[in-house]
Amino acid sequence: MPIQVVSADFAKTATRPEEWPRGATPEIAFVGRSNVGKSSMLNALARRKGLARVSSTPGRTRALQFFDLSYRPTPAARPRAIRFCDLPGYGYAKVARAERDRWTAMIEDYLRDRDVLRAVVLIVDARHPPSESDEDAAAFLVSAGRRLVVAATKTDKLPKARRVLALQQVERALGLARGDAVPFSAVEGTGTDALWARLAALAAEEPQTAEAEPPA
């Protein structure tokens, strides 16, 4: 049964740990290459257009963006709180090196140190094999002890006959079991319920972290 979203609101922007939201609300982070469809995914999950700003300009997100949501896993359940964190996209070459380095440090600090972080959604473009940056991100998250969910976006741009093969390509490249990657299309509205089901289950678990070194 689909998750019922009760409310979804922008919470705050943060660039330093002292600005991160306080409290015990479980968080799910979203990371991926610039222009891979993170904002569209967040809006689809929130059942609210315009919650996260969708831009045609890659690299617009330059800070951590937090969103507070309330949802019911079943119609009879009491509302539960969850927080989404939209991380700056990686792989945007037109950003100055110093700025990219600042983003990288900010993201790595969050992914290592955030004690309420329950899982990270790594978003990849289903039309292409995962990039080296995608593979590095997956390796870093695993080494950090973070629970990883891979979502393959823009499946609507692929012929239906190619979608299964495209997902298998993503899974092989990132070392996932068959069926682990979630196919997602904000245009077709597919994958939202499947992704929500995973995130709600992970939000109910205790956080899990480990010491990590940045990928070489």
UniProtKB/Swiss-Prot annotation:
MF terms (GO), sorted A to Z: GTP binding; metal ion binding
Tree of life domain: Bacteria
Protein residues bound to GTP: 32-39, 59-63, 86-89, 153-156, 184-186
Binding site for Mg(2+): S39, T61
Database matches in CDD domains: YihA_EngB
Pfam families: MMR_HSR1
Cofactor dependency: Mg(2+)
HAMAP family: GTPase_EngB
Similarity annotation: Belongs to the TRAFAC class TrmE-Era-EngA-EngB-Septin-like GTPase superfamily. EngB GTPase family.
Database matches in NCBIfam families: GTPase_YsxC (TIGR03598)
Name of the protein: Probable GTP-binding protein EngB
Organism this protein belongs to: Anaeromyxobacter sp. (strain K)
